[in-house]
Amino acid sequence: MTNSLNHVKVKPEKLAATAVELMERELVVPKLFARKGIEDFKGARDDTVNVRVPGILPARDYEWRNNRAQPLSFDEYRERKLAVRFGGNAYSATMLTDEQREMDFLGWTQDILPAQSRAVARKLEYGAIKALQTGKYSVTIGAGTGGDAQNVLNAIIEARHALNRMGASKVKRTLVIGSDWDTILQGSKALQAAAVGDSVAESAFADALLGKVKGFDVVVSEDIAPDEAYALTGDSFVFLNAAPGIPESAVAGASMLSQDGIAMRWLRDYDPQYQVERSTVNTWYGYQQVLDPVIYVDDQGQEVVSDEEYNIRSVKLKLDKVATTTKYFPEGSDKAKVAKGLGLTKTPPGITYLPDPA
């Protein structure tokens, strides 16, 4: 009787699929952004593509039974172009000697690939956090310095009011909070427990999803400043993500897409000169904030389209003094007209903040 070993070769596609799912499970903030892939960018100049955004027009009123002395007013229709580009190549590269591969580790799938996937995921997460922190905000709201739960809830209500007045989408609204906000809200009865389904179970996003408050899904991030929070709609930022193809010179490799659309490439080869096996995991990425012209009603009751573009899809909140932190439309050539036309010049009636401790 002949003894034989049945070796089962694991396909690169299967390893890459495992790695991309591991990477996707580590993401929190990037999953809150609108995603676009590589097909929109192929052939684009300077790695940039202009995404067409429909224009907006004001509505006017032609007086009933007027003497027809004045003609209709014609407004110019202008479509906008949002320039988005890939600006990053997040990667993790490592190598194993023959001795390490045979004696020290259990293989690429159990040790190395998971570590590489988590490293790339952290890079994507940090990029999304930076996009949040460096973005432009037409509305910033202070929630006081005392850590009072009612002040925090008031700030969230004020953020909701601002988004509503700016005409932001009510679909997929999320409140991304730092650890100090998390501590305050955990002790508040206003936080409704989240019902996490199978699609997000056992992931960093599921762990970060606390529940709902005032119409927002509340997601905690340890990577943003503890005293900051961001009220977002699902299209506040664009997350560009794609995996490059596999070069013919690679010994093994695959490009994969997770169930949630996160792309990643894994390459493996062997260097005979140094007798080491090399593994590289990478993904292309970029982030872009979305700004819009604002349509508002002027003093004559006429709809007007703003000259400048503003952030009307997200609001920044901070555990800081209300009087000095809360700002409505602090920048822009027609900021005063826009703020007045939207009714967003100050904290709305009905919201009263408790004074900060002395």
Where would I find each of the regions flagged by the language model?
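N-terminal "assembly arms/tails" that initiate or stabilize quaternary assembly
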Residues: 1-86, 326-358
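Short, Lys/Arg-rich flexible segments
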Residues: 1-36, 93, 98-107, 121-140, ...
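Extended, compositionally biased alpha-helical segments that mediate assembly or anchoring
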Residues: 2-7, 252-358
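Short alpha-helical segments and helix-capping/turn motifs at coil-helix boundaries
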Residues: 31-38, 160-161, 263-265
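Long, contiguous amphipathic alpha-helices that act as assembly "spine/axial" helices in icosahedral shell
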Residues: 51, 79-141, 166-179, 218, ...
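Short, solvent-exposed loop/turn elements at domain surfaces
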Residues: 58-62, 184, 228
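Extended, solvent-exposed, turn-rich assembly/linker loops in the middle of proteins
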Residues: 136-217
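Extended serine/threonine-enriched, polar tracts that run as long, contiguous segments within proteins
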Residues: 178, 210, 216-269
